[in-house]
Design a protein with these regions (language model features):
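Acidic/polar low-complexity surface segments
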Residues: 7, 13, 74-77, 81-83
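Active-site/ligand-binding-proximal alpha/beta "capping" segment
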Residues: 121
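Left-handed beta-helix
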Residues: 21, 26-27, 32-33, 38-39, ...
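Terminal amphipathic alpha-helical/low-complexity segments used for targeting or macromolecular assembly
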Residues: 1-22
């Protein structure tokens, strides 16, 4: 069962977010563009997941807690390919964390308020 409304799951530049089975997206969260959320993933209040200029992938059974920002790094002169955001399975992203153009492996706990930036691998 998918719990979300069309207003908070939005297309961007021809890409519409895709969600697996039993995904929960709180009505106050926003998921935009080239985003895939794995089975049994939860996205809690006031989260922004914005795959506008690159892709975002979140594995199965992950939890994106209140107030998180998940974004990508666009291509530019110093980084011609940009950085997607890749999050593994069974990951918990603590309240108000910011993940930007990085890779987080499986079974990782990202602490509340953490910031993980472009190109980092955890």
């Amino acid at each position: 069962m998918k719990h979300h409304t069309d207003g908070n799951v939005r297309s961007f530049d021809g890409h519409r977010p895709r969600t697996g089975a039993r995904v929960l997206i709180d009505p106050s969260a926003v998921v935009i563009g080239d985003v895939e959320l794995g089975d049994d993933t939860s996205v809690w209040p006031q989260v922004s997941i914005r795959g506008d200029m690159h892709r975002i992938r979140v594995g199965a059974r992950s939890s994106v807690q209140d107030g998180c920002v998940l974004h990508i790094t666009h291509a530019g002169p110093f980084n011609p390919d940009g950085w997607p955001l890749q999050i593994g399975s069974e990951v918990t992203i603590g309240h108000k964390a910011t993940l930007h153009g990085c890779t987080v492996g499986d079974r990782v706990l990202v602490g509340m308020g953490a910031t993980i930036m472009d190109g980092a691998v955890v």
